[in-house]
Amino acid sequence: MIASPDRTPLPREFFDRPVLEVAPDLLGRILVRTGPDGPITLRLTEVEAYDGQNDPGSHAYRGRTPRNEVMFGPPGHVYVYFTYGMWFCMNLVCGPEGRSSAVLLRAGEIIDGAELARTRRLSARNDKELAKGPARLATALGVDRALNGTDACTSQETPLRILTGTPVPGDQVRNGPRTGVAGEGGVHPWRYWVADDPTVSPYRAHVPRKRRS
């Protein structure tokens, strides 16, 4: 059987480009998460670009560590990190190996497997909120550290794959500052989203944490 065009895995060459090219081009692409409970399919509607050691907002800004090792590897692999002691977030590595650039997957529309996603996101008021925000997206898809380093652009059956989908036309793509990024990194307009899409998360500027007295 010939695969339909929108379900063809994205080639590694897609990710082997500058992060500011890859990030907006990921909008409309399809993410398939396959786990023991069943598959969930999601259409990406919001992402953020992080340009490695050149970017103060990036985990790789201060160099290679055990935590960010995957960011320095081949493009097209999954980088998962744990944040605030509670949530996982998922990125796709891009650019040439060693560049350490990645795209944070911020939001998407669940197009298949919503029933399973609802069991993981009990606080969601409706299906548009199931993957509205990076931690919610990861929770809905059942993402954890076990996915860190997964090759997402392969034709093989893996726990997570990124497929061609339907790219969003340029006139429907918006961009602005990244959510919650402080300092110099906060001025870059490297957050990209689908205009007027109800699954896109609201922008929030960085708010310094108050120290306990």
UniProtKB/Swiss-Prot annotation:
Assigned keywords, A-Z: DNA damage, DNA repair, Hydrolase
EC numbers on record: 3.2.2.-
SUPFAM superfamilies from the UniProt entry: FMT C-terminal domain-like (SSF50486)
A Pfam family reported for this protein in Swiss-Prot or TrEMBL: Pur_DNA_glyco
Gene Ontology MF, one: alkylbase DNA N-glycosylase activity
CDD domains in the cross-refs: AAG (cd00540)
Keyword Hydrolase: yes
GO biological process, one term: base-excision repair
DNA damage in keyword set: yes
InterPro entries: Formyl_transferase-like_C_sf, MPG, MPG_sf
Family: Belongs to the DNA glycosylase MPG family.
Name recorded for this polypeptide: Putative 3-methyladenine DNA glycosylase
Organism: Streptomyces coelicolor (strain ATCC BAA-471 / A3(2) / M145)
